[in-house]
Structures are given as structure tokens and as C-alpha cells.
Amino acid sequence: MPFAQPVLLLAVVSAISVLSAQPRALVENIDVAPALEVPSPENVDGPIIQLALLLDTSNSMDGLINQARTRLWSIVNEMSAIAVAGEVPQLQVALYQYGNSGISAAEDHVQLRCRFTTDLDIVSEQLFALSTKGGNEYCGAVLREALTELSWVGTGRKHVLRLVVIAGNEPFNQGTEPFGEWTSHAMKRDIRINTIFCGPEQEGRRTLWEQGALSGNGYYAFINQDYQEPEIETPFDDALKQLNDALNGTYIGYGRRGAESLKRQEMQDQFNASASVSGFFSRVLSKSSSNYATGSWDLVSGVEDGSIALEDIDSKSLPEEYRGLSWSSA
């Protein structure tokens, strides 16, 4: 495997399959349109992890969705602890929902919610926007869309880990699209298909979820999406919330996306805090990592990573309180 040893892949999938703890409180779905047009990840010379999440949003999957919302940040923290050739890989995440009868049958009940992006607040926003509705769960169809619609990095590039994680609870071979055709297609492009069955281990094997992973050179996991993990308050909770507020005060939104992104950041803090205490603090930790990429809208991060030159900034793109100020490189 050109990216790293197989144990790394197992660690990545293990982090994702920690979707085994139900948050203590559900957050009501919000009405947000799919973020189909998102900032394209910046071209980087270093290592990359591309992660496509394919989530079943049929009636029985409320627990899975709420787990994914809060566990996103644990995944980010796991990714940020990985170093390849001394560099932390850039994490790009995409999101699909499938199996929802609110999506047209002509589309095989499959919907792209978010293309590959490094803006994890957009991913979080789309997760909180998901709602469940009974439908037909076609794993082959959603694999087809993810493998052909997303911009996967080519196999000629070194130090790239390409992952699909698909989660659900109906037979993996539902529908007319043969999943084996697409797992074979994925292997040729060095994209690994990992499956998470929401139910007993043997049931997942019987309904071909393990076969889906094996044929896609990935890993099979099973979870109880209704397991409830207790939330334990600590003496540090209030202090961590205050530190998060202080951190938020260091972001300076600029350009077309600045104000919108600051508002999104605030809303995702609120949604994550109301869904799960542990999930919220995982998010706070993620915000201090390199994989919480804000350079496309935050002036401080943009200057720090070299994507913005202060002398090139149009003062009209800055918040009003910063317009007309001079700057110094000292």
C-alpha cells in the first residue's frame, strides 16, 4: 500500500467504526440544502486522506445519523494524529445519503450532500441536516455515484489514502446495480471500500456486508446503532467551553465566505454541544488541529498558511471594524 502500512488503514477504519455510542440527546434536523458546491481542496504536495461517507437515511437509521454527527470530530482527531513522512495528511471528506424515499426513485434514492472538502464545518452542517424517511437501500447505486461523481486523486500520486465507508442495515445486494462491479472498479483505482453493518455480526455477513468489504479490499465492522453511552460531566467542562469561545474570537472572516463561515462555525458549535458533551469537546480539540482548515475564509489562518498576502487583500472584503487599518510585518 503506497500510503502506509495496513495497520494504519485499520486504525482509520476503527476510528470511523466508533459509531457505536448514541448521543444522549437528539438534535432536530435543520433545513439545509446539499452543499454540492464547496471550496475545492487546495492542491498540496503532501499526503492526503480522502474519505467518502455513505450513510443509510431510511427510517431505521436515526441512531446511525446522530452517531455520525458527533463522531465526525473523533475521526478528525484520529487523522490529525497520523504522520506520513513527517507530515500530517490533508483530510478531505465527502458525504452521501442513500435509502431515503424523499429522494427520487429515478436517482436510486441516492443524494450527494457534500463533495470532497477540507471545510469540516460544511460536513457537520450537512450531517445535522439529514433526516430519515423509509426507502430502498441500494448499496451498489450509492457506490457507483461515489466512485464516479467525486474527484478522487489519481493513482499516480504517492501518499494518498482513498477510503469509502458505507453504513446501513439492509442486504448489501439490494437493487439492480451489482455491488461487485463497483468494488472491483474501486480496487483498480486503489479506493478501499469499508462497510459498517448496523446489526449483529453474523447478520451482516449473511447479507453480504462483509463480502462488500472483502471484495473492496477494505474492512468489515458491525455496530449496535442504538447503544447508549453515558455522558459524564467533568470539572473541566466549563473551562473548555470558555476556551472554545476565546478561540472563536481569533477568527477574522474575510471575502465572500467570511461572514457565512463564521455563522456556520457558531451554529455547528451549538448543534454539537446540544447533541453530545463528548462530541462537542472532540470538536473543540479538532479546531486546534491542522485538519480544521479555515484558510479559505479566515484571515489569520490564510496568512499563517501562506494562501493570503495581506498586501493583496481588498479592504472591502474585511469586516467593517478592520477596514482602513494599516498592517506591519514586524
Q: Where in the sequence are the language-model features?
A:
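Extracytoplasmic/secreted cell-surface and envelope-processing proteins
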Residues: M61-L64, I103-E107, F172-G180, Q202-L208, ...
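Loop/turn elements at helix/coil->beta-strand transitions in domains of secreted/extracellular proteins
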Residues: P47-I49, P89-V93, R157-V164, K188-N194, ...
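Von Willebrand factor
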Residues: E37, V44-V110, R115-V165, N173, E203-T207
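C-terminal "exit" segments of structured domains
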Residues: L214-G216, Y220-E311
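Acidic/histidine-rich, surface-exposed loop or edge segments in extracytoplasmic proteins
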Residues: D45-S60, D121-A129, R189-D190, D312-S317, ...
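Bacterial N-terminal signal peptides
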Residues: P6-S17
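VWA/integrin I-like adhesion module and closely mimicked acidic/polar interface patches used
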Residues: E170-S215
